[in-house]
Amino acid sequence: MQLRERRILLLGAGGAARGAIGPLLDEHPLELTIANRTVEKAELLAGIFASAGPIRAMAFGELQGPFDLIINSTSASLSGAIPTISADLIHPHIAVYDMMYGQGDTPFNEWARKFGAQKIMDGLGMLVAQAAESFAIWRGIRPGTKQVISELRRNLGMR
């Protein structure tokens, strides 16, 4: 997905979010919004990356779209919960990405699909890419990832 000139919403302000912000800003989005239950944590992260690109922070309840991409980096899916954001942020042309993954849709992706999102992705690809990068660091060879991801999805009965 092309991220240049796109409006990106990043849910969560923990370690996973922090690791994603630099690479997201490197793609020159129109704006990156970090939203969190505690806005102070989002503001802290936005402050750290303020010189890297257009970034702002807000509380979940303050969010107003439209966004082109929503990334869920919260741990909510682990407990079957969904971040408390408005379903009005979801529309048919939005891309939704949950850093979590499982055999079926994550609770967040299931919720987004219910409200009309059609492009839905999970974090399995990120997991495999991280493993490939680690392998490259230790072995000097970067393995392909597409076939591994496809095979994992097939073997685990995933979409």
Model-identified regions with their sequence ranges:
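Hydrophobic Val/Ile/Leu positions in short beta-strands of Rossmann-like dinucleotide-binding domains
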Residues: L10-L11, I34, D98
